[in-house]
Amino acid sequence: DRSSAAIPDPSQPSGWRQLTGDEVGSLLGDQKAREVVAVTEPADLPSQMLANSIVSSRLLSKIAEDLGVGHTNTLTGFKWISRVPGLVFGYEEALGYCVDPDYVRDKDGISASTKLAALAASLKSEGRTLQDKLDDFAKKFGLHATGPLTIRVEDLSLIAKGMENLRSEGLKEIAGSPVVKTIDLAEGSDKLPPTDGMMYFTERDDRVVVRPSGTEPKLK
């Protein structure tokens, strides 16, 4: 149910670099959006939806806006992504991709791997690589760097206490940049149902999402 990929990188000791889930998601999402644009009337494009979880990169939303297709964020998990009306592509940063929801309306590593291989082959025929495509995104939309941090605990009560402290005390600064906006995901919104989590935005537009794992004794 997952798809992982590595690309040649001479700067790495192994000669290879593993792509992040967000990098693969942006590559596959852009590929799918372009396929949709080629066969869809312009007036219908906003109903053709790209989707990703709230803990995934914001890059896909910019790709969607640039190409004129729709985009939405969902809670973590494909039970949410797969429910998006008009879904044509969905992903989450934990290496899960839905590239053909008409046939497999769930994360599917086999179809995602074949689509990524096809994209790599198409780029190769042009004398380009997947890294070149990622560089195109950075030049057009700005660099989107993402990184997960997981804290495993033995005492589950520590997770609840940690989330309680974040809500009661808040954060004023992250990595030297003042926090300018805080969203308590437990309050829900007109776009998202309530979930246990906090989202922070800093003055330099960094974004940090803190949430408990839904399946393991971890804070992510």
PLM regions with names:
Residues 21-31:
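Catalytic or ion-translocation cores adjacent to nucleophile or general acid/base/metal-coordination motifs
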